[in-house]
């Protein structure tokens, strides 16, 4: 479907779509979970999915992006954590409670440093409002940023994030990580100055290495 959509009509034309209408969930809750390392957050994601605990949404941001987003949108994210995860469940009250408790237990097994569950729908929406403001918030970190887009197996999240950190040091360029953790879709944001030719050159090389590594671990360019 992604290939067909991305081809913009070149590979074919969709003439009919059948959709299934779902009931509005009885209960929707989200949680903010802090971690001491981004690798811990990646391992937590892989374990949550492996144990059959399927969330309605699951996103991760690193410390640099969390701080920028807090400054930009006053989202109230944990500022002392190296990585932060937003995880959301919907369904019946019983199912949501069971899933949230299971996710909390898995997070604790992966060294979570904090966990805050939404107490109202407005608080839940506030959690997500910060994530949606993440990209514009990058304006406080650098004059420009280049967004990479790659998908990897969820079990490889911790490994790939560790490699991105290594490459950041290699190229001496800051990187802010945001990604759709539930499906392994990464968006590393490389901070640079487009008016500096050397900075732009290093950024392009850095980005290419990230995407090559995504493919190396069994992922794809998206």
Predicted feature residues:
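Noncatalytic alpha-helical scaffold of FAD-dependent oxidoreductases
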Residues: 1-222
């Amino acid at each position: 479907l992604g290939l067909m959509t991305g081809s913009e009509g070149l590979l074919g034309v969709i003439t009919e779509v059948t959709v299934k209408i779902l009931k509005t969930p009885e209960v929707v809750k989200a949680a903010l979970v802090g971690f001491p390392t981004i690798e811990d957050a990646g391992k937590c994601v892989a374990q949550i999915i492996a144990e059959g605990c399927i969330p309605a949404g699951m996103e991760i941001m690193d410390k640099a992006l969390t701080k920028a987003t807090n400054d930009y949108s006053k989202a109230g994210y944990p500022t002392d954590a190296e990585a932060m995860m937003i995880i959301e469940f919907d369904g019946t009250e019983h199912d949501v409670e069971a899933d949230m408790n299971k996710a909390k237990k898995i997070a604790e097994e992966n060294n979570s440093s904090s966990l805050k569950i939404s107490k109202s729908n407005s608080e839940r929406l506030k959690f997500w409002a910060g994530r949606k403001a993440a990209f514009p918030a990058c304006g406080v970190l650098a004059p420009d940023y280049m967004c990479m887009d790659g998908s990897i197996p969820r079990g490889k999240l911790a490994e790939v994030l560790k490699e991105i950190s290594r490459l950041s040091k290699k190229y001496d360029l800051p990187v802010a990580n945001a990604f759709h953790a539930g499906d392994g879709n990464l968006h590393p944001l490389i901070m640079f100055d487009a008016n500096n030719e050397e900075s732009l050159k290093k950024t392009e090389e850095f980005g290419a290495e990230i995407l090559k590594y995504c493919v190396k671990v069994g992922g794809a360019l998206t």
